[in-house]
Regions:
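Active-site neighborhoods and metal-handling regions in enzymes and metal-associated proteins
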Residues: 1-390, 394
């Protein structure tokens, strides 16, 4: 597909998204909606700057930004009226709303700070503008949760990139390398494979550190006879992937083998049982019940998964107290885990897309082989040299 054709397709998609958003705005009885979350601006307008405000009503589609991004916005968001503003909302929004005849303005309650909303409310009173601020959540996120074919294509490429990178990463995980060194090597692999940066800090957690679900790589040296949890992702054309595997250096002990098999069974059960129309807490229950029955329910302390798209964590959220409904077109992770404090943990994470009512697994990296050889990086180099010398002397 040529660049001009691809851009034309994306422009049509954004116009369609804007139409759906306007329907949602009308259904909520709002005159307009103010958006500031970067992923939502990108989704609706194509704007990639780090500072901007999108205002949408039945008649208006406005992208407001400061001097730094005006020219960029004109190039990326040609279907929107671009206005240059000061960065503080309260300095310009009340006057604009008054000029456009808006009286009920929705805003992203989970993204605008308390201080910003307070200053905006005070400015509305001071300027005697007839404007009611209405907190909203999830309006655009609901639209983003159903992936269009082009979006799914980008996500699939990001997943394939991580699959390929993991095969290379397994050669890095050896006794003697630190968690930080391994994480850096994995990041380099991801970038070399074509990832547009990384969507989150790579996790390499070994031994007891693998019992920390969101561990950060440390100076700890990876040793033989311990688990190593790897969590990484890639980004292609703005769309993310998310992936976890747990490896073991050498022959796994009985406890690790047990919890690994339980986690794998929990994940497989969830993948096979999840259906469109299912409540997300029911989806979580599919895996959680397996772990609870095995006696480890109290150490599976996070939800089963989360949506992935322009953000690495987005709607839907699959957890024991969530109540969203799954639908065809949603892309999300399935990542049960067991974490034994002071010993180690296991998490296995795949990405799936709901199609024809069932989950199709996007992630292809193997899960049934988790034990790695224990020779060190120095031994690995010596072994490769010996193999090379044997080939030369033949």
């Amino acid at each position: 597909m040529t660049n001009s054709l691809a851009e034309g397709t994306r422009r049509k998609s954004r116009i369609k998204r804007l139409r759906k958003l306007r329907t949602s705005i009308a259904e909520k009885g709002l005159d307009a909606l103010l958006l500031s979350q970067p992923e939502n601006l990108l989704y609706l307008s194509g704007f990639t700057g780090s500072s901007g405000w999108l205002l949408t009503s039945e008649q208006n589609a406005i992208l407001a930004t400061d001097f730094r991004y005006v020219e960029q916005a004109k190039g990326e968001s040609s279907d929107f009226e671009i206005i240059q503003t000061k960065r503080e909302l309260h300095n310009w929004l009340p006057g604009l709303a008054s000029d456009l005849g808006w009286h009920k303005l929705g805003f992203e309650a989970n993204f605008i700070s308390y201080d910003s909303s307070r200053k905006l409310s005070e400015a509305i009173k001071t300027k005697q503008v007839n404007l009611e601020l209405v907190p909203t959540t999830g309006i655009v996120e609901q639209l983003r949760s159903i992936k269009e074919p082009e979006e799914l294509g980008f996500i699939t490429k990001a997943v394939e990139l991580v699959d390929a990178a993991f095969e290379q990463a397994k050669a890095i995980i050896r006794p003697g390398i630190t968690e930080k060194e391994a994480a850096w090597e994995i990041e380099k692999i991801l970038r070399q494979e074509g990832s547009e940066g990384i969507p989150f800090e790579i996790i390499v957690a070994s031994g007891p550190n693998s019992a920390l679900p969101h561990a950060r790589p440390t100076e700890k040296t990876i040793c033989s006879g311990e688990p190593v949890l790897i969590d990484m992702g890639a980004r292609i054309s703005g769309y993310c992937s998310d992936f976890s595997r747990t490896l073991f250096l050498g022959k796994a002990d009985k406890t690790f083998q047990e919890i690994y098999n339980i986690v794998l069974k929990a994940q497989t059960t969830a993948i096979e049982g999840i259906e469109s129309g299912m409540d997300t807490s029911q989806a979580d229950r599919l895996a959680r019940s397996i772990i609870e029955q095995a006696g480890y329910g109290d150490v599976f302390g996070h939800g089963l998964g989360h949506g992935v798209g322009l953000a690495v964590h987005e709607f839907p959220m699959l957890g024991p107290s969530s109540s969203d409904l799954l639908a065809d077109g949603m892309v999300f992770t399935i990542e049960p885990g067991i974490y034994l404090a002071g010993q180690g943990g296991v998490r296995i994470e795949d990405m799936v897309v709901l199609e024809n009512g069932k989950a199709r697994v996007l992630t292809k990296a193997r899960k049934n082989s988790f034990q790695l050889p224990t020779f060190s990086n120095q031994q690995k180099s010596q072994r490769e040299d010996r193999m090379f010398n044997r080939e030369v002397t033949k």
